[in-house]
């Protein structure tokens, strides 16, 4: 978990352009002891590769993979530019978060920040806030608790002909949850409820509100109070904006009808907007693709941006979910939400497309992911096959075969082992040492046993292939030095691997 202090936050900053804003972020990171002086070039180089603008006025400049060694300790520096900074392609950044992180710290840190910043209203607040403590609290999510209504807060079929009884039931329930103080109770009991119409009434208080909460009670039979119908009472405790969408829904005719006639589940769904606000991935006829991420560093900003660009080529609505983390379903066109999924190497992603070009979209995404989304990927195929299916079909078919799942730039060769004793521990170790010389991912397969491709950098896995004299081994390499790796492997096998 990222620790952010007020000293890391710089409000009401000024910069003439994006480069100066990045320079300010790096200077603050250097002064805080997070990075070495040369880190600036890494941040500028990253911007040339892919813009770090996430959306909602937020940019997250950070270094390239080559500059991670210059990071002394993980940290961030946050700058607020109320006037906005042009960040390219017409995007305006109001909050710039300079990040220094190594290895997977980069993804976890981004995930934490984007979880807070994915809300447009929150991002808009951060662009204008003048109090450092409040800015820090919102950025760290300390004041952004999701608004929920427990099922216990819905009381139905109350046998009463008293409006005050319904109010008291609600107030008591809110008090049990520590959502209100005693003065709130006194206020709603002693002051008249307000009629919404259709037999619904509302009570609240300007004092004694502790946290956002709502309770609803409904009489078994309708009755009259001062000449007006009474069927149900809503009692509200409000301390933050998170409850506002629910308050707006109280004015909706359909929601009011549900309050008057629905069961507890239907009422909760209507009040929280669950039926319309939550993404779904179970539409009949939708095309579903399940793919494994093979990028060594997962889906950080650059491959995520490439994924978004691929998605935007198609007109279909496309959502995605990180199955490995059991994440929520998000739009595959939102860079911020994709980065927030915290996808690392080996994670399984589920895409659902709905529309005329849904099948083409999912097939294209599968190929783009298999090819690394602009980065080098492991030559070892995923442990589970990538699949594409159509919702409602009974057949669940692999999207690609193992060979099809190899990156397009993979280089492979087949060599015959000549060692009299095959590949026991010693020659296997020499083979592994040769493979590790190269900046490449190398997988190996025993063709004679039709084994799976396994990492050629694992001594245990090579020995487990059961290679004897005359065995044909297939090597597949990807990466900058793939060809050199294949050539080196061929040479060392030809020389007998030290025997």
Curated annotation (Swiss-Prot):
The PTS EIIA type-2 domain covers which part of the protein? Answer: 2-142
Gene Ontology annotations for the cellular component aspect, listed alphabetically: cytoplasm; plasma membrane
Chief localization: cytoplasm
MF terms (GO), sorted A to Z: kinase activity; protein-phosphocysteine-sugar phosphotransferase activity
Q: Cross-referenced CDD domains, in alphabetical order?
A: PTS-HPr_like (cd00367), PTS_IIA_fru (cd00211)
Where is the protein situated, by its record's location annotation? Cytoplasm
- One GO term of the biological process aspect: phosphoenolpyruvate-dependent sugar phosphotransferase system
Expression triggers: Induced by fructose and repressed by FruR.
Q: Name one Pfam family in it.
A: PTS_EIIA_2
Query: Highest taxon of the source?
Result: Bacteria
What does the UniProt keyword field contain? Cytoplasm, Kinase, Phosphoprotein, Phosphotransferase system, Repeat, Sugar transport, Transferase, Transport
Give a yes or no for keyword Membrane in this entry.
Answer: no
List the active site.
Answer: 62 (tele-phosphohistidine intermediate), 300 (pros-phosphohistidine intermediate), 424 (pros-phosphohistidine intermediate)
**Which PROSITE patterns does the record cross-reference, listed alphabetically?**
PTS_EIIA_TYPE_2 (PS51094), PTS_EIIA_TYPE_2_HIS (PS00372), PTS_HPR_DOM (PS51350), PTS_HPR_HIS (PS00369), PTS_HPR_SER (PS00589)
State the residue spans of region: Linker. 378-409
**Region spans: M domain:** 155-285
Q: Which stretches make up the HPr domain? A: 286-376, 410-499
Q: Phosphohistidine is carried by which residues?
A: 62, 300, 424
InterPro entries, sorted: FruB, HPr-like, HPr-like_sf, PTrfase/Anion_transptr, PTS_EIIA_type-2_dom, PTS_HPr_His_P_site, PTS_HPr_Ser_P_site, Sugar_PTS
* Function text: The phosphoenolpyruvate-dependent sugar phosphotransferase system (sugar PTS), a major carbohydrate active transport system, catalyzes the phosphorylation of incoming sugar substrates concomitantly with their translocation across the cell membrane. The enzyme II FruAB PTS system is involved in fructose transport.
Q: Which PANTHER family match?
A: MANNITOL PERMEASE IIC COMPONENT, MULTIPHOSPHORYL TRANSFER PROTEIN
NCBIfam families assigned to the protein according to its UniProt record, in alphabetical order: PRK11109.1, PRK13779.1, PTS_HPr_family
- What does the domain comment read? The PTS EIIA type-2 domain is phosphorylated by phospho-HPr on a histidyl residue. Then, it transfers the phosphoryl group to the PTS EIIB type-2 domain. In contrast to classical PTS systems, the fructose-specific PTS has no requirement for HPr; FruB combines a IIA domain with two HPr domains.
- Put simply, this protein is called Multiphosphoryl transfer protein
This chain's source organism reads Haemophilus influenzae (strain ATCC 51907 / DSM 11121 / KW20 / Rd)
Q: Which gene encodes it?
A: fruB
């Amino acid at each position: 978990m990222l620790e952010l202090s007020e000293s890391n936050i710089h409000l009401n900053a000024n910069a003439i352009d994006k480069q100066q804003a990045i320079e300010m972020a790096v200077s603050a990171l250097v002064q805080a002891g997070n990075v070495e002086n040369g880190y600036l070039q890494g941040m500028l180089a990253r911007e040339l590769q892919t813009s770090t603008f996430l959306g909602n006025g937020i940019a997250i400049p950070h270094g390239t993979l080559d500059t991670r060694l210059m990071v002394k300790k993980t940290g961030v520096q946050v700058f607020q530019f109320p006037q906005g900074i042009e960040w390219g392609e017409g995007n305006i950044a109001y909050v710039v978060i300079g990040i220094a992180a190594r290895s997977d710290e980069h993804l976890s840190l981004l995930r934490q920040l984007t979880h807070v910043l994915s809300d447009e209203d929150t991002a808009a607040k951060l662009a204008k806030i003048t109090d450092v403590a409040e800015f820090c609290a919102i950025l760290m999510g300390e004041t952004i608790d999701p608004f929920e209504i427990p099922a216990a807060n819905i009381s139905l079929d109350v046998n009463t002909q008293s409006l005050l009884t319904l109010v008291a039931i609600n107030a008591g329930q809110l008090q049990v949850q520590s959502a209100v103080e005693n003065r709130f109770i006194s206020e709603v009991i002693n002051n008249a409820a307000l009629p919404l119409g259709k037999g619904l009434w509302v009570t609240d208080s300007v004092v004694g509100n502790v946290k956002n909460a709502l309770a609803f009670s409904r009489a078994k039979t309708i009755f009259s109070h001062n000449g007006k119908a009474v069927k149900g009472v809503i009692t509200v405790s409000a301390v933050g904006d998170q409850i506002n969408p629910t308050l707006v829904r109280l004015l909706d005719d359909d929601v009011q009808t549900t309050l008057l006639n629905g069961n507890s589940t239907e009422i909760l769904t209507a009040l929280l907007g669950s039926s319309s606000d939550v993404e779904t991935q179970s539409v009949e006829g939708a095309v579903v693709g399940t793919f494994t991420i093979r990028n060594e560093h997962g889906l950080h900003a650059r491959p995520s941006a490439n994924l978004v660009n691929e998605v935007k080529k198609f007109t279909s609505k496309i959502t995605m979910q990180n199955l490995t983390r059991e994440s929520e379903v998000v739009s595959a066109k939102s860079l911020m939400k994709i980065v927030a999924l915290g996808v690392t190497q080996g994670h399984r992603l589920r895409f659902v497309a709905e529309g005329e070009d849904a099948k083409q979209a999912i097939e294209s995404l599968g190929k783009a992911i298999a090819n690394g989304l602009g980065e080098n990927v492991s030559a070892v195929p995923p442990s589970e096959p990538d699949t594409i299916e159509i919702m409602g079909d009974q057949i669940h078919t692999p999207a690609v075969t193992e060979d099809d799942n190899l990156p397009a730039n993979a280089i492979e060769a087949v060599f015959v082992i000549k060692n009299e004793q095959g590949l026991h521990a010693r020659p296997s170790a020499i083979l592994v040492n040769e493979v590790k010389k190269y900046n490449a991912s190398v997988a190996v397969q025993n063709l004679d046993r039709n084994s799976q491709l396994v990492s050629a950098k694992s001594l245990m896995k090579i020995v487990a292939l059961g290679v004897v004299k005359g065995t044909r081994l297939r090597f597949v390499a990807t990466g900058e030095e793939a060809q050199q790796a294949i050539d080196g492997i061929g040479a060392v096998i030809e020389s007998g691997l030290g025997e």
